[in-house]
Amino acid sequence: MKTLNRRDFPGAQYPDRIIQFGEGNFLRAFVDWQIDLLNEHTDLNAGIVVVRPIATDFPPSLSTQDGLYTTIIRGLNEQGEAVSDARLIRSVNREISAYADFDAFLRLAHNPEMRFVFSNTTEAGISYHAGDRFDDAPPVSYPAKLTRLLFERYQHFAGAADKGWVIIPCELIDYNGEALQALVLRYAAEWQLPQAFIRWLTSANTFCSTLVDRIVTGYPRDEVAALEAQTGYKDAFLDTAEHFYLFVIQGPASLAAELRLDKLPLNVRIVDDIKPYKERKVAILNGAHTALVPVAFLAGIDTVGEAMNDAEICAFVEKAIYDEIIPVLDLPRDELESFASAVTGRFRNPYIKHQLLSIALNGMTKYRTRILPQLLAGQQKSGQLPPRLTFALAALIAFYRGEREGERYPVQDDAEWLARYQTLWARHRDRQMSTRELVTAVLSVEAHWEQDLSQIPGLVEQVTADLDAILSRGMRDAVQPLC
């Protein structure tokens, strides 16, 4: 069986117009997959040069397959049918290492056709590295590398206003474009680069903040033989992802036409502010996950998919989303409901086995950031505590007992919470502490909740009643009235 390469598998090729920092699975099944669709169906005509931003030879370079690789997109489509779609991605031209070939890296700035910069250098990538110098070949941090590359372009084109770039980071941090621009400006000032360059940075270049959403499951190790038998070639860079994707870019309206989104309506939104979209994702997608985990796990279920195929647990989650989360969010209801419907479809994806215990990691912080704002907003709006979001808090406290049907399971959180729960549950077991006292002890940790939740009218009472029901009757019986 042949390995992918352009000689044996000839096809479309596109001129270099995009620089991409990062060669990982996510960008390849998200950004590059979208660019490939735009290249095929519009006149975008933009090839990608991947820059490996760190000094490592693993995994091997995409250039070993001439930039070619296959994405397998699978999950439930909008009609709820299971679909699996293989696509040979032809839009990546080559990969270069900023470390092994620094000159080739700088030469990317000399190409007049270069227009876009995408990146995913992990959450830690957009950060300041004190030791980075202008003369380093290359500097360590991604923002310093980008500053050096932008200065190379500025010099090569003598500060031409039409040679700036549209810079679209995909790292999972808030307002990633603004954070990246601030660091680029910091390096420019520290390196004492000319004021004219700093003016060009802000006037000729556009830094966009983004929200990215797609579960990318990467190289399908267990299925490679079967998948390669279907495609008819060997592919060391096979990349799998779910059917759903959403790309929200905070940038000028003109970007839609420049990316040819007017000619192929992908699920890409060019918006003035990503904040409501971020809040929607955190509240609905992440919030539903966090509410689901302790309830489903203590009901004897191990994966998200199984939970969504369980009529009662599914009803609990859907009612939490539609009756308690959506009413307090700040976007049109129909838009929120369509997003929620996509979310529950994603949870049912038969191709992804999402273990509840792995999502349970750091559950206390997740509850505070993902669910608590909606619980408090709901209580303020109606004067009533949202029953399912409150029950999810009781379920979370029960989860930290670390025991299901008499069997222990690992609980992962910061050491302080683990120690606190160990003490509280031991005292409760020895009847030195009532359920109400245990609940009060958890809700009054101001350093965590950023307020004393035990002072919220009725919250201690309701969480105590729910927790007592879970402990005395079991999760199935306790959750039933809320399904």
From Swiss-Prot:
<dbReference type="Pfam" id="PF08125">
    <property type="entry name" value="Mannitol_dh_C"/>
</dbReference>
<dbReference type="InterPro" id="IPR036291">
    <property type="entry name" value="NAD(P)-bd_dom_sf"/>
</dbReference>
<dbReference type="GO" id="GO:0019698">
    <property type="term" value="P:D-galacturonate catabolic process"/>
</dbReference>
<feature type="binding site">
    <location>
        <begin position="18"/>
        <end position="29"/>
    </location>
    <ligand>
        <name>NAD(+)</name>
    </ligand>
</feature>
<dbReference type="GO" id="GO:0005829">
    <property type="term" value="C:cytosol"/>
</dbReference>
<dbReference type="GO" id="GO:0009026">
    <property type="term" value="F:tagaturonate reductase activity"/>
</dbReference>
<dbReference type="InterPro" id="IPR013328">
    <property type="entry name" value="6PGD_dom2"/>
</dbReference>
<dbReference type="Pfam" id="PF01232">
    <property type="entry name" value="Mannitol_dh"/>
</dbReference>
<comment type="similarity">
    <text>Belongs to the mannitol dehydrogenase family. UxaB subfamily.</text>
</comment>
<protein>
    <recommendedName>
        <fullName>Altronate oxidoreductase</fullName>
        <ecNumber>1.1.1.58</ecNumber>
    </recommendedName>
</protein>
<dbReference type="InterPro" id="IPR013131">
    <property type="entry name" value="Mannitol_DH_N"/>
</dbReference>
<dbReference type="InterPro" id="IPR008927">
    <property type="entry name" value="6-PGluconate_DH-like_C_sf"/>
</dbReference>
<dbReference type="InterPro" id="IPR013118">
    <property type="entry name" value="Mannitol_DH_C"/>
</dbReference>
<dbReference type="GO" id="GO:0019592">
    <property type="term" value="P:mannitol catabolic process"/>
</dbReference>
<dbReference type="InterPro" id="IPR023668">
    <property type="entry name" value="Altronate_OxRdtase"/>
</dbReference>
<dbReference type="GO" id="GO:0008926">
    <property type="term" value="F:mannitol-1-phosphate 5-dehydrogenase activity"/>
</dbReference>
<keyword id="KW-0520">NAD</keyword>
<keyword id="KW-0560">Oxidoreductase</keyword>
<comment type="pathway">
    <text>Carbohydrate metabolism; pentose and glucuronate interconversion.</text>
</comment>
